[in-house]
Design a protein with these regions (language model features):
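Terminal targeting signals and extreme-terminal segments of soluble enzymes
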Residues: 1-73, 79-138
């Protein structure tokens, strides 16, 4: 299971002093990019390498608030279904589950046309473990 940690910054909070809801998808994206970099599917030196994964859909369930200074841990699981890549996320603050999410992506070429998954992506996904009942709240 891939894990990504980060600390909540002040600018990510709102007038209620909690993380604004729009930031959860950003946190999930950070975790997804870190996952892909670790697996050498994205190259930090080539920003265009990350552009291939177009977002088809997103879902987020907010369970508990996060605040400035909290350290969060995001767990990521991924699978390939045909031409779609599905990512699921669990965000934790200490031992409390604060959010769950799912994003769905497809691979696009420079002309923005749908492409089949690359051999590298297929090989990577064959190694990934997937738990069908992992998300409890979506």
């Amino acid at each position: 299971m891939f894990e990504y940690s980060r600390r909540i910054q002040f600018y990510e909070t709102d007038l209620m002093r909690i993380v604004h809801h729009s930031n959860y998808l950003r946190f999930f994206e950070e975790a997804r990019v870190a996952w892909a970099v670790q697996r050498q599917l994205i190259d930090w030196r080539d920003p265009h390498s990350a552009a291939a994964f177009a977002v088809l859909g997103t879902e987020v369930r907010h369970l508990l608030p996060c605040r400035f200074g909290d350290t969060i841990k995001i767990q990521v699981q991924a699978r390939l279904t045909g031409v779609r890549v599905v990512f699921e996320y669990k965000m934790w603050k200490k031992k409390q589950l604060v959010s769950e999410g799912r994003t769905e992506h497809v691979n696009l070429g420079p002309d923005l046309k749908l492409q089949r998954p690359t051999p590298e992506l297929k090989q990577c996904m064959e190694k990934e473990q997937w738990n069908e009942t992992w998300l409890l709240n979506l």
